[in-house]
Amino acid sequence: GDVKALLSQPGTADCDVIFGPLYTHQVKPLGDFCKQHDIRLVVPFSINGSDVCYNTNIYQVYQNPDEQNNAAIKAFLERFPNHHPVFIDCNDSTSKKGAFTFALRNQLQLAKRDYSITNLNNSEQMFLKAFSRTKPNIVILNTGRSPELNVAIAKLNGLVANVPGISISLFGYTEWLMYTKYQSANFHKFNTYIPTTFYYNAVNANTINLERSYSRWFGEPMQYAQPRFAITGYDHCQFFVRGIRHFGKNFCGYRSQQVKFPLQTPLSFERTFSPSKKEGGWQNKCYMLIHYMLDGGLES
């Protein structure tokens, strides 16, 4: 829709922060308005365009797929320097994970690190050949889908049963967080790492309290989704409103300026620059590796 009607409302120019817009074409007019009146514009949704690189008042939460892939690869290389990577081809013609696995393999080659490739349809004997007996193995599938994950875990369970002492961890995808209800035990068994920009913890006391309050306010539970959109909005609001109240004009959205611990969606902004190296706005760079530990614990 047209944002001009919103911008003409009394008091809008006096805001400290505006959350939105929903659509890419709304970013420029809203951004120009916010720059004119020195208002922070928070863009929480998936948009296209590079306005954030040219407007110092824009805070872009969304990280595009390339940025997320690069963050996941960086985290992988830092966390697993001594592991043997095993890529499993899951024969999923609909998968969009090829960009990630190709880029990761390329980085491993540049670092002169060995890795193996196997196929989900291989015999147990052929499947086993891809794994190291002397190093811990880190397994990467080339799909985020649940059916292929089920088959892979079944094959890995067979491997562990037949080869005592073999060490296997899984490196997954954000989609796997949707499967935790029935995969949690397997994630812990295989020391699983899931890269993500959010983590919904259903047993966190503060999360439970917010969900109860939400149901009381709106007469229905939060929408079942990963992430919980209501909690995303809550975290964003807490981050900016408390940050601005505490730091005033000095609030830039750095991780160190986080006043209240987020329930689900942490934020950490870094300054962007235009192609001509002129200062731009702020891009969220927060990224986590959720680790399902062998002892049943969780860490990030």
Can you annotate each of these PLM segments?
Residues 1-300:
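Extracytosolic ligand-binding ectodomains
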